[in-house]
Amino acid sequence: VTLAKTITISNSHNYGDMEVKAVNSGGSAYCGGIVGYANKAITITSSSSNGAFTVGKDVTIKDNLYFGAMVSMTGTTFTTTDCSSTNNAQGKGFTTSASVSQFYPGWVGKGATTQVTHTIKNCWNDTDFTATTDFSAGSSCYMTLGISDAVSGAKCSYNIENFTASGDLNFYGNANALFYAGSIFGYWRGSGTMKITNCISTGTHTYDATFKGRTTIAGLVGYKSSKPGITFTTCENASDI
């Protein structure tokens, strides 16, 4: 299945929730979520919402639908620029769900040899900013927001620049899988980077990775031979980091 190549949202404002939404269900085929199996990029520019700002909510897989998701296994970029929200941003454009039936931005499928980059620039949120990655079922698929494939050495990067939150700034990676569960920055031979630059929060900055299941993964930076880089530059807050 090959769907759209590019999705662009520019100069948009919504007084309620703002959602870019796609639902895929049923069948036994490769399905690619919002931008398809062979997509190029998603760009959200100068957009704001007085409610929640969510991209990729309820992108659901059922009955042997594999890979794809919002960025596919072919490599692409996901960029959110000049965006704002007056509600909890839930990762500023990244949906959060504990259900394995959800596809997330950046899912790199098993066997992929891809590079995926997420960039969030010039964004603010007047409550908490939370980027949460949950994986909670037995599966040989992997988590998101910089998860690299466990076999092929895929590389994913996650960049946050010039971000302001008037609440907490949280980054969590949680896995409760019965099989391979990655970490925020890569797994096994995979590698990736995370750069957090000029981020301000009046609450707590939290970077955490918790893993429960058959395979225990150690900490924020991945497992085994992954060599991710984590960079914090000019970040400040009014509480702990």
Where are these regions (language model features)?
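Surface-exposed loop/turn motifs in large extracellular/passenger domains
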Residues: V1-I241
